[in-house]
Structure formats: C-alpha cells, structure tokens
Amino acid sequence: MSESTAYTIILHGNDATGKSTLVPALRAAGEVIYARGDDDATLEDTIVVRSFDKFTLRLADDDRGPLPQSYTDKDGVQRRIVRIILDADLDVLQARLAKRPSTDQWESEKSLFYFRARFLGHQELAAYHGLPVINTGEKSLDETMAEIIALARNPETLALFSKLALRTLTPEDVASLADRRAVIAGVDYAKRLEDIIAAECGETSLFTPEDVRAQCLEDPGLVHALVNHHDNLHDAEAPLRLRQIVEGESKQIYKVESPLTHHFDNLVLVFLKPTIYSHSKQATAEISGLSAVRASGSRLFLEMLHRAGISHTYHGLSAHGLIWARSTEITQIETVYKELCAGTDKHSFFGMAADPNVTLPTGQYKRGPYVRFDWRNPNHVYNGVNPATHPFYHLMEASVGKNAFYDKYLTGRAKPLGDKCVPEELVHSVQAVEASVDWTTRIFFTIQHYLHQIGLEVQDGCVMLDPTGRIMWSEINQDCMRIKRRERTETTNGSHQGVFDKDVWRAGGSSVKEAILDKWTQLNGLLREHLAGRPFHENEMVAAFEPYGMHATEVLADKTLTLTPRYRALYERLATHDRSLLRSGGSADKAASERLLALMQEHIWQAIAAVPPLNGHDEAKRMVRLANTFARRVGLPPAEVSALSDADAETILGRTATPPGSKAIGVTANKYADKTDEFALAELGIKLLRPTGRCLRITYELVDQAKYTKAFGAGVTVHFVPTRPKDMPGLLAQGMLDGAVTYSSVMDNFPTVARLVASTPDADISLALIRRRGQAIDPHGWSADRPARIVAEHGRMVRAHLAGLGVSPTTYEIQHVLGSSESYLVNDPRETYLLCDAVIATGGTIQENDLDVWQVVKNKGELLVGLYQRV
C-alpha cells in the first residue's frame, strides 16, 4: 500500500456493538485498526481512540475541536484516519450483553440508551464530526467487514461525510448546496415561468399572476428559484446536492442526494429559521440569532429526554440551527400537555380559570395535569385551501420579506384558522392514544423534574409524535412550552423577569425582540449549568428511578389534587419504572427471561381463546417473537433455533401414557366430585370408591360391563388418577393421561386435545359474564386504544360469546385467571376490570358482593360433564 493510499481504521461505539469481534477479524484481513480496549496507548494523543468516549460524558456543545485526520506511523508512512461509529438496536445490544458472564451499571438499559443516543442512536457525535455509522445488528460479520473496508478505501465518500458535519456546516453552506437560484443550461426560464403561473395561479392561489410577475421584476433571481423548485431542476452531475422537500413557518427540511452513498437516505437536514409566530396574536417576526438560541435550547431538553430513555428523531444539532434527524412517519396530531388553565384553555373555556370545581387558586387543574390532542390546521386558509402549500409560497415570502409578506398576503387576503382540539375518539385511527398520553406525560414530567431543581416550572407544552405515540419528532425548546419561575415575587409579577417562554414576545411583540433573545439565552444558561454539574453517569445512571417517575411520585403525593383513575394508574406505573437493573449471576438477564416466560404463558392463553380457535395469527407472531428473544437471552445460538423442526414436537405429541390395553383416567378430587361420581356410575358403568383420610388411591367397582366396554373398549383395564380439572388438558397433551372425566367448561376452554366419548348435561349450573351491580356496559364504546379488560377463567367461551354479539376482539383484553375471578371486580377501586366470568350455581357469591349477571354465556343444561379421551 502506497503512502498516498495508506489508512488506519478506528472503530467507536457503544458496548456490544461488535468492536471486540471486528478488530481481530479485520486485522486478520490485513487492516490496521484500533478500538477502545484494543488500542496503542503510545498513539492515543495522535489518533484519539479511548479519549473519544469522553465526549459522551460531557454536554453537547460547539466548543469541541476537530479530530485528527491523519498521522505518521513508526515507519514514517503518512496514514489517513478512517473513523467509523458502530451501532446496533437496543435489543440487539442487550441480547449480546446477556451472553457475557457479568455486567455493570454502564450496561444497564438506561446506560445503553443514553450512550447510544450520545454515540449514534441519535448520532450526536456522528452528526457533529461527520462520521459514517454502520449498524452491526443488521449484517453478518463478513458483510460488516466488507462495508468497513469499502468505506476506508473511498476517500471521496468520506469527504462527503466531513462536508456535512455539523461542526463546520453553516446555513450558507446549505444554501450553496441547495443552490435554489442556479441557472441550469438549456432552460427557457421566462417561458417556463409563464407556463407554471398559468397552471398554479388560479382561483385558489393566494397569488395572482401579476403578483408573481411584479415580484420577479423587483427580484430577477426569483424567476430561477420558482422554476427550479417547481420542476426540481438541478445540476445532475453534482456529487452532492441538498434538495428542499418541505418548508414551514419555522423550519426548512432538506434531503441529501448523492450517487456516492445511501447513508443519508433515511435522514433529513433541518434548518431552524430565525422566526417566531403567535396564532393568538396573529403576529410573526424574524429575530436575528433566534435559530442558535432555539438549537441550544433543544440540545439541553434533548439531554433531559436522553437521560429518561425517551426517543427523538433528532440525531444532532449545531449552534447554527442545523439538525440531522431521522425520517419518520408523521400524523396531523399535535399532543398538548396542560397543568394550568392558561393559554388556549383559558381563552377557549370562558370562566374555567375561576371555577373552583375545575381549578385551584394556583390555576392548576384540580384533577391534575392532562393530555389533549389538537388537529394541526394551517395557520391561514384562502378560498378553502392552505396557502402555504402553494409551490411559490415560501419563495415569495423570502423575496418579499416576512413582515411585508404577512401584512400584504396573509392579513390582507387570507383567513386565520389554527389548530383545533380533537376528541380522542377521532385520534385512534391516526395515532395510538394511550401510548401518546403515556409518552407525552413522560416527556413533560421529565422536563418538570429538572426545571423544579432550578426553581422553574413548565405549565404546558406541545409535542408531535409518530403514529405509535412513542417517538417524538418535533422541536423541543422554549418555543413550544410555557416556562415560568415557581415562586412569583412582587418584583416579578407584572413583568417578564420570571417568564422564559414566548409569552414575553406575545405581550410585547416586535418591541421586545432583544428581550426574548435575552430571556431564552438566560434559560439555556441555567439549564446548561445545572445539567453539566450533574453528569448522567454520576446521577441518573446509578439512580433507582427515572426522572419522570420521581415527578410522578410528587404528583401522587399532592393532597390538593384529585386525580382521575386513568391518570393515577399511569402515574403509579411511571413512579415504579426502573431501567437501572443489571444482569448478573450468569449468561442471561434472569429477571427479564423470567418475565418473558410469564408473557409467553399469558399469550398462550390468549391464543387458546382466539375466535375461532385456530385464527390466532397475531398471538402466534407475538409468541414467536417472545420465544426468539427468550432463546437469545439464555444463549441459544440462532442456528440451533432455526434447526428446530416439527419432529421435536411430534416426539412429545406421540408419547403414550400407559401400555396398550391400559388407560389412565383423570378425575376431579374435590369440587364437583359428586357430579363426577354420578356420571361415572350412570354412563361408564363404574362406581368410584374414593379413599378417606390422607389416602390418595381411587378404586372402583365394575357395575355395568356393557357401558364400561362402550366407553373404554373391550379388554382394557382402567385406573383413575385424582387430578385438578385445569391440569387435565396439559396432562392429556403430554401423554400423562389417556382420558379425563370433567366438565366441558374445562375442556372447551383449552386446546382440543381430547374427544368427548360420553356426556350428561348439568342442569344446575350456568356460565355468565358478571358486572358490578347496575353498571352500564356498552361494548360498542370499547376501542383498540382503550380496550375493556375482562377477567376470565373460560376465555374461549367468553370470546365466542362476544363474537356472537358482534364485538371485535381488538376492543377488549382478557386477563386469564384460574379461579375467584369475581374477586378482581370486588377488590378493584380503580375499576381496572369491567367484567369477569363465573360458573353460577346458587348465585350467592354475586349477591353478597354487589354484582349481577350482564350476559349468560352458557345456560343451565349447556355445560356438560363427560368422559374425554386423548386424540
């Protein structure tokens, strides 16, 4: 290798991303390579390997200098440094760590999430320094090695990463790479503009043809911008282009287009425009320097979210207001958090702020914080359309000037609209409601936790989430929340001294541009000082609770609040959430593995109860995922998992309980034993002789040979085994029993492992769905996002009955129990469960516990006692 092409590979990344596997493999392939733990200490100052990780222990800022690009080795050869960050999804990292003999606090779930966010999950260091990222969880070892080597041998592609590094990228660079006013050879711009005007400036256009022509006379370069943007014209030979795909009131969004790499295919570059807007005041402005302040604030709020394990699409931000973000699916929903009756609530709900039934004297809601949903409407409409979607809109705005454009076109022609509150029932079809409430609460409880520590509070705020409700994609800073001092003094009341949000500008408008810059900068300084003085690895990483959980505990303890059952249950769950648990005592995370086993058992019950029984596709998928995860956690190699075949199951299914000519029959030992004995005598020709005392052996007298032979066959001997009814199906499936005398309410709610040979109806008992006495039950009000919860022993029968009523199985959940299901309704002050099932004989239990029958699932005489023989 010549000096001009010599290079050294340096791998960085979170624990378990594959560094220790890749380094020896690449060295064996002839590469010069280093990674943390496998580096040359004498070269540390020259190439920066181990010390690179220290960047994850400090807050993100723009004071970090450049990394070395090359060095001279001991042989005097000048070598390029090829620096690559390795990544893998969190579950992959955890599965790999599960195979290690021990782990420490640096490898807990919360640590892996945080440092992945700082390294590359949100790619802060990768985005800042312009480093390529390779996901080792998606490729084999050979594929990963090939990708690393290909990158190392392609300086042109690596230069593209460097060019797009947030450390050096400026808004001017973005404008140059977008080159919206470029003159493309061979285009007749004047003629093409007239064609576009004719097509786009019709009845629903905010602009008349004369508006566009007049502005182009004042600004000739606008002609090129309008045509280029409309027709997506650009230099097709350019190795790198930024194509603007979206522009809004506060942001421009670009896609990277380059023939050199697909690395940026799932990323977007966001530019925060130096703008501010208030719908309530119908005012807008540009404030020089605001982009940098918003970006710095976003960095600090993202730091809080990273510490709490909350995902955001932002990878990294710069002081220029530039952001690398992951592309994601979005919805029209804005999720709003409210603690006080202020802002929109105060102005929309007349008198609510002073109503003692709704609010406290502090302005807080008596029922505590709540989350609502808004439909994101255009700020203005013109002739029934959103004028901002016009292909000329933002280019005309930039050319005319923001304030002049607003006055002439929006105030003068369009009508204000703005976002509107939307009922949850309408949100379900576009965004997961309960997950959105959960995650929005986590976001603002986390922020509240940190703000309280410096004497501030967030009173309300808004975020935007993906359809799952679990990934945030919107801006997060002072611009999207209301932040005040907790203790307002006489000197701050009536002034802006205790206000750190957009209310400063709402109150003063353009006259307070400098004031809002000053207040937002002050807030950034307070947050930075506090977070820098409490680094994650010394505080949250070793804490037993999450930031949002600690604030949830405070809210639960607030005696002035009367929380609703829905939110109390949410806060109780958040208060006990702990992501700091460590793996220990073996090669697997025992606690997680045990939980996986319990989940698999529960999903088996759900699959058993599927309607019809064989239509359990969704549950089958869930069980496969859980089983594969469990296999990884206990160290079973993937090759062994895939090698398992039907033959392994057939071996068990073919097992016989007893030798030919003999049968083992299970019979109940206690409840309904008298009914079992009566059936055996009447239908099987057998008188069961049950023991007394502690003896367990059951014998019998043969009373009717013909009935016995019909039931069991000629020449067959039978012995009886006292068995719990709910154990019978499993014992039959495993071949431990050949048959069982039991009820259809048992056998018909398990997988079909036996056939009914003989039976007698029981006219004394029925099966019913039970409710709290007099409670209204409307299955049509159940939904997938807010499903009804039902406690049931007889899941299959319950599902079949509800299906007969036309109730979708996606709108309710069955919690399987093995007995005393009524107790879950009786001892449930939060009313978590709506219904339970029960076998009813006299009805005494439901009467004494203030319950009644909602629906009869099986009438008296429809439940059978019978002999079931293994199939």
Swiss-Prot record:
Domain of life: Eukaryota
Induction info: Expression slightly increases by addition of L-alanine that activates cordycepin production, as well as during the development of fruiting bodies. Expression is positively regulated by the two key transcription factors Kruppel-like factor 4 (Klf4) and retinoid X receptor alpha (Rxra).
Biotechnology usage: Cordycepin has antitumor, antibacterial, antifungal, antivirus, and immune regulation properties; thus, cordycepin has important value in commerce, medicine, and scientific research.
Outcome of gene disruption: Impairs the production of cordycepin and pentostatin.
Principal EC category: transferase
A Pfam family recorded for this sequence: SAICAR_synt
One GO molecular-function entry: kinase activity
InterPro entries per the UniProt record, alphabetical: P-loop_NTPase, SAICAR_synt/ADE2_N
Pathway(s) served: Secondary metabolite biosynthesis
Gene Ontology biological-process entries: purine nucleotide biosynthetic process
Keywords, alphabetical: ATP-binding, Kinase, Ligase, Nucleotide-binding, Purine biosynthesis, Transferase
E.C. designation(s): 2.7.1.-, 2.4.2.-
Other information: Cordycepin and pentostatin biosynthesis coupling is an important point of metabolic regulation where pentostatin safeguards cordycepin from deamination by inhibiting adenosine deaminase (ADA) activity. ADA is not inhibited until cordycepin reaches self-toxic levels, at which point ADA derepression occurs allowing for detoxification of cordycepin to 3'-deoxyinosine.
Role description: Nucleoside/nucleotide kinase; part of the gene cluster that mediates the biosynthesis of cordycepin (COR) and pentostatin (PTN), two adenosine analogs with related bioactivity profiles as both mimic adenosine and can inhibit some of the processes that are adenosine dependent. Within the pathway, cns3 catalyzes both the first step of cordycepin biosynthesis by phosphorylating adenosine into 3'-AMP via its kinase activity and the conversion of adenosine into pentostatin via its ATP phosphoribosyltransferase activity.
Protein name as it appears in the record: Bifunctional cordycepin biosynthesis cluster protein 3
Native source species: Cordyceps militaris (strain CM01)
Top-level taxonomy: Eukaryota, Fungi, Dikarya, Ascomycota, Pezizomycotina
